[in-house]
Amino acid sequence: MDYIKEWILPQDPEVAEAIAQEEQRQRYKIELIASENFVSRAVMAAQGSVLTNKYAEGYPGKRYYGGCEYVDIVEDLARERVKKLFGAEHANVQPHSGAQANTAVYFAMLKPGDTVLGMNLSHGGHLTHGSPVNISGMYYNFVAYGVDQVTERIDYDVVRQLALEHRPKLIVAGASAYPRQIDFARLREIADEADSYFMVDMAHIAGLVAAGLHQNPVPYAHFVTTTTHKTLRGPRGGLILCQEEFAKAIDKAIFPGIQGGPLMHVIAAKAVAFGEALKPEFVEYQKRIVENAKVLSETLAEKGFRIVSGGTDNHLMLVDVRSKGLTGKEAEYILDEVGITVNKNTIPYDPASPMVTSGIRIGTPAVTSRGMDTLAMKKIAAAIDIALSEPNEAGAAKARDMVAALCAEYPLYPNLD
């Protein structure tokens, strides 16, 4: 990219080289990590703007620094656009990450030791949903729910049973590796019956929700958190949506509760991404993500891979690689060597450790952003099958050639040299 040569290379060749190498990796490998995506040039430019220079503690119209009149415009644009996008009453666009957004809701509504019901990490949940190694699991009494051992889907009757037994202050829904639709309306019924608050972390599916391809949690949840990247295709960051009655508590939890100055250049990039998501073409893009995931999942199944829960309703799938005599760790390494990037991932009731795993997680947002279609998904499935079924140099060479051909056919940032 020109800016690397023009601005970074003369000042810091070591950093310039690392950025250039990462650019090459993104261009010439197939990105299938479900939580990653490629932002637009407009989002990238906004994040690299002069707004990175501005401190703006507080909120629009109520800052602790002068000179905030223009960053106020940017933050207001981000808030109003995302409220329109999801039909929310209140939005806080300042969280630096999804983890910060989740922590802020806990900080606003819970006291240390309060009971919370959240999805088991090994069944597809997230670290911030009560993992004992995360602050959420250290500060609060999380009770885990998971998926049925046979269907590998959430059993809402079991969730109800746990909720009525433990009477949690908060029920958390959402996942980082769950390939099926989540019934937020049903979970709100359970929360009401248990006299619990209800929070949805829609980080992975926010883009699908915005496009109307997944049930919108906003009408059902007291709080909705998300990242702004992944399927939403914005910059890396977080977001909280809530009902107006909780607005002050949420805003205070972010600032001055757990953060200081907001990252105004990132908020500008969020505003641009929300603007993009409001356009009709974003809906078509999300439809392609889901269609690509379905075809990729079905094609892998045809080639002998077991797909957790039997398929996917969204942008991701979990693939059990034991049928190929491999662990998830081994499969991730083999695929990376041929230019396909995935991540090892536990599958429900996994006998292997989280650092080894029996599965890999695959997602289609990034390849869809490159313009890849269902035919390309079939080619990707073939390359994955060859690489993992023939873990030798001959198989690797075939897979590399297929990856190279796909990357050439669907270039990343083609007009950016």
Swiss-Prot record:
It catalyses: (6R)-5,10-methylene-5,6,7,8-tetrahydrofolate + glycine + H2O = (6S)-5,6,7,8-tetrahydrofolate + L-serine. The keyword Transferase applies. Keywords: Amino-acid biosynthesis, Cytoplasm, One-carbon metabolism, Pyridoxal phosphate, Transferase. Its EC number is 2.1.2.1. Pfam families: SHMT (PF00464). Its main location: cytoplasm. Pathway: One-carbon metabolism; tetrahydrofolate interconversion; Amino-acid biosynthesis; glycine biosynthesis; glycine from L-serine: step 1/1. The record marks 229 as: Plays an important role in substrate specificity. Its cofactor is pyridoxal 5'-phosphate. GO terms for biological process: glycine biosynthetic process from serine; tetrahydrofolate interconversion. The modification N6-(pyridoxal phosphate)lysine is found at residue 230. The keyword Cytoplasm applies. Gene3D superfamilies: Aspartate Aminotransferase, domain 1, Type I PLP-dependent aspartate aminotransferase-like (Major domain). GO terms for molecular function: glycine hydroxymethyltransferase activity; pyridoxal phosphate binding. (6S)-5,6,7,8-tetrahydrofolate binds at residues 121, 125-127, 245. SUPFAM superfamilies: PLP-dependent transferases. It is found in: Cytoplasm. Catalyzes the reversible interconversion of serine and glycine with tetrahydrofolate (THF) serving as the one-carbon carrier. This reaction serves as the major source of one-carbon groups required for the biosynthesis of purines, thymidylate, methionine, and other important biomolecules. Also exhibits THF-independent aldolase activity toward beta-hydroxyamino acids, producing glycine and aldehydes, via a retro-aldol mechanism. NCBIfam families: PRK00011.1. Homodimer. This is Serine hydroxymethyltransferase.
